[in-house]
Regions:
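Short alpha-helical segments that sit at the start of domains
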Residues: 1-22
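Residues within the helices of the helix-turn-helix
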Residues: 25, 35-36
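Short capping segments at the starts of secondary-structure elements
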Residues: 30-34
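A short acidic, leucine-rich amphipathic alpha-helix
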Residues: 37-41
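Key DNA-contact positions within bacterial/archaeal DNA-binding proteins
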Residues: 47
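Short, hydrophobic-biased segments on the C-terminal half of alpha helices
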Residues: 53-54
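Beta-hairpin "wing" of winged helix-turn-helix
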Residues: 58-68, 76
Length: 94
């Protein structure tokens, strides 16, 4: 089994949480955000947001970049699944 296949998250798990969908949608429409700004924009607490981010990082949809003590989260638009989800969000909200 390839690393890409191991990182797959089921659609049910991906959309099982409103908070996770909020994180995905916000990152898909923003370039890069730190966790404080992301929490502010989606109105979730730090702990919940961090938990959702970890699932999304493990799935390969989001990337975490570390600059000293600062962590920046980026939507991996180069991933076909991430690109498809971004298109879905854009169509759904148009």
């Amino acid at each position: 089994m390839s690393a890409e296949t191991e990182n797959r998250i089921s659609v049910e798990d991906l959309f099982s949480s409103k908070g996770r969908v909020k994180v995905l949608r916000e990152l898909a429409t923003s370039s890069e955000l730190n966790i404080s700004e992301l929490c502010r924009r989606i109105s979730l607490n730090h702990s919940s947001t961090k938990s959702h981010l970890q699932v999304l990082i493990n799935s390969g949809l989001v990337e975490e970049k570390v600059f000293g003590r600062i962590k920046i989260y980026r939507y991996r638009i180069e991933d076909l699944r991430a690109r498809s989800l971004k298109n879905f969000f854009e169509l759904w909200h148009s």
